[in-house]
């Protein structure tokens, strides 16, 4: 599987170049802005193209070396796309609400994940000994935990890289990653704060088409990294009785085919 490809035209069609009204800008973003049109800042796509390309290579290389990528996007416009993209490539996501300490207090988060697993086992087994109210209360607990932790319950440890949509809204996630030395890829709109973002991608972080494009490209880069990891391991997949998890992810992605055109190589 080749690295995901993209063109300047795709970025333009997705509205990646549209920033916010000039009164909402962050002066720290000045180096990434091309100009102003109708009181709206225009992002310099001549910079976006190489910076997005670099970010995708970082994703691929991280995964090729066995690393984990955490997709973060909790605002309504991003939530579904973040979850779908992460699931498509076998990675992890937070799309409901960032809980304080999700990275810096991983031990406590691990305890909550363990509780979620216990509830899953309880509800999938015999609940005959429980009252209807008890089952309802446990189910509600599970739903609450699943919303917050469902995307990371299989992560098994801290991520090696964060991919963030809306660095202003996900400020806490970026601060925690910075404290732990975890690199961050972040989409930076004209009102964004670039502090703590290791690999910036200047671009609109509100338009659904733009968000979908970023997510599809990052997901494609992960899949390319998985392919590289499998190739480097020298596994004879055809001779194996059971397929590695990574291969299952690649097969599922291949089955989707043209459903994610932005991820196509």
Swiss-Prot record:
Transmembrane segments annotated in the record for this chain: none
Could you cite one Gene Ontology molecular function of this protein?
structural constituent of ribosome
GO-annotated cellular components: cytosolic small ribosomal subunit
Q: Write the protein's name.
A: Small ribosomal subunit protein uS2
Taxonomically, the superkingdom here is Bacteria
> What NCBIfam families does this protein's entry cite?
rpsB_bact
The taxonomy runs:
Bacteria, Pseudomonadati, Pseudomonadota, Alphaproteobacteria, Acetobacterales
Q: Gene name on record? A: rpsB
Task: Report the family membership.
Answer: Belongs to the universal ribosomal protein uS2 family.
Q: Which InterPro entries match?
A: Ribosomal_uS2, Ribosomal_uS2_bac/mit/plastid, Ribosomal_uS2_CS, Ribosomal_uS2_flav_dom_sf
Signal recorded as keyword: no
Alphabetically list the UniProt keywords: Ribonucleoprotein, Ribosomal protein
Q: Which GO terms describe its biological process?
A: translation
Output the Gene3D superfamilies linked to this UniProt entry.
Glucose-6-phosphate isomerase like protein, domain 1, Helix hairpin bin
């Amino acid at each position: 599987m080749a690295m995901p490809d993209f063109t300047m035209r795709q970025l333009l069609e997705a509205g990646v170049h549209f920033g916010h009204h000039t009164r909402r800008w962050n002066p720290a973003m000045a180096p990434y802005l091309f100009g102003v049109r109708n009181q709206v800042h225009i992002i310099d796509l001549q910079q976006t193209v190489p910076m997005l390309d670099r970010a995708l290579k970082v994703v691929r290389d991280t995964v090729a070396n066995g690393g984990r990528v955490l997709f973060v996007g909790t605002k309504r416009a991003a939530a579904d796309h973040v979850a779908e993209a992460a699931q498509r490539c076998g990675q992890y996501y937070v799309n409901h609400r960032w809980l304080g300490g999700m990275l810096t207090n991983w031990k406590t988060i691990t305890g909550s994940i363990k509780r979620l697993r216990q509830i899953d086992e309880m509800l999938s087994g015999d609940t005959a000994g429980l009252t209807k109210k008890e089952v309802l209360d446990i189910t509600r607990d599970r739903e609450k935990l699943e919303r917050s932790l469902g995307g990371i319950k299989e992560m098994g440890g801290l991520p090696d890289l964060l991919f963030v949509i809306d660095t202003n809204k996900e400020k806490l996630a970026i601060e925690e990653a910075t404290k732990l030395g975890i690199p961050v890829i972040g989409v930076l709109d004209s009102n964004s704060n670039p502090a703590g973002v290791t690999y910036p991608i200047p671009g609109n972080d509100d338009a659904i088409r733009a968000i979908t494009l970023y997510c599809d490209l990052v997901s494609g880069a992960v899949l390319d990294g998985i392919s590289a990891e499998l190739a480097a391991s020298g596994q004879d997949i055809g001779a194996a009785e059971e397929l590695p998890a990574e291969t299952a992810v690649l097969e599922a992605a291949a089955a989707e085919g043209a459903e994610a055109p932005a991820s196509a190589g």
